[in-house]
Amino acid sequence: MDVTPVLLLILDGFGYRESADFNAILAARKPNWDALWRDYPHTLINASEKFVGLPSGQMGNSEVGHLNIGAGRLVYQDLSRVDVAIEDGSFFTNPSLSKAVALSKQNDSTLHIMGLLSPGGVHSHENHIFAMLEMAARAGLKKVYLHAFLDGRDTPPRSATQSLQLLQDKCTALKTGQIASIVGRFYAMDRDNRWERVQPAYELLTQGRTEFTATDALSALEQAYARGESDEFVKPTAIVSGSAENTMQDGDVVIFMNFRADRAREITRALTDEAFGGFNRAYVPKLASFVTLSSYGEDFHLPCAYTQDAIHNGFGEYISNLGLRQLRIAETEKYAHVTYFFSGGREQPYPGEDRILVPSPKVATYDLKPEMSAFEVTDKLEAAILSRQYHAIICNYANGDMVGHSGNMEAATQAIEALDICIGRMVNAMRSIGGEVIITADHGNAEQMLDRTTQQAHTAHTLNPVPFLYIGRKAQLTESGALRDLAPSLLTMMGLPQPAEMTGHSLIQFAGCNKPVLSAVEGRSALHQ
């Protein structure tokens, strides 16, 4: 089939904000991006709130973004679904959750509720944890322990005090529940196979083995702050109150309240996989049940409360069925997003789909290596483009998001400058084979590095729109759109009809000229490599 080869470059965390105040994207020297933005059609699209299936005021994130991009339609998110279920009361009769509570009551065993205690809404929401505690209280459970993973990444770096106080107040009001441990998400929610981080969290949950203890959660947090730790990096701390055993034991029931899969998978595997080999587990509790709020993937055979509706005829499936070749490429931190999430929750590649995983650098935080593995990704991507094997390539560059999360303005600026070099190489490679490019982002982050309200580093995502830059034929673009419009736009570029299941709209309208104009402007926008 004769189609125009296309490249979708997703610059993770590369939002649009006109103010230069602590804006790493505007601060960066980026001659390639500036030339492309000047010379090619561009617009801004929405990547948060209702435009990606999230509640009003809720920032977008990588999982949500890639689901919407790959599906080519609005995909309602687990956050919204659980919020609605709590509001209409159906949450409290959810079969998987009800069965777990009933099993704990029947066996007079302990119920452990664990998850990211945060109002961030990216991986979890504290209101869901409060509702689960209420459900346990309604059932008359008294042995209920809460294991709070702390955020500081999708929330201000030191903001967990309020969340812990709210949880403690909820326990007091319901007369059930006790906070058994706190730990930063750095340890409990790794997604890069950094098992040396996960192991301390695992040992905290199963043995209470930790360097730090406290008599209550707020005191534990104060001690962590005194050690210079922010919420994300709070070292595992056991809350010791009385003689009761508050770690996970044989016969106990666990409910994991994170709804986003990518950072829930590793700790779940450590707690549930008999063949686990990430580290030596000194003690493995024989849990009566382990329930997840949402599905963490096809390879986890665990009961879950809310399953994602199947997405049929997303971009990857559709072009595969047409016999076309595609490539997905990213470094480790975003690999799941261009594969599993982009494919609507499908683990396995489609026929004709290749995948390239480039390992992320082994550093404590990515501000220590702002370029991350972008140049290695670019080397492999450039070779793939020049091989002329692929009709469509989906690539994610992680830098804007992962370095943006550090709150380090200088490092984030360096990250964007590294990306600019990569952008130049990729656009030139696509030019050489007569291909076309969309450059966009899944959500904002690096364009806002300081929270002027709190005067703390801004480490979270934003509500800002993201760029849509089309590098190809003469065209007119729709003035605005959303992430769901990217797949239809790619199909327009490829000259393919849009399947009925895709309800997004192409942002590209060709202006009566099918001849590429890349070479015509090369003299005044030649890209730096």
Predicted regions and their residues:
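Feature captures the catalytic ectodomains and active-site-proximal regions of enzymes
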Residues: 1-513, 518, 527-529
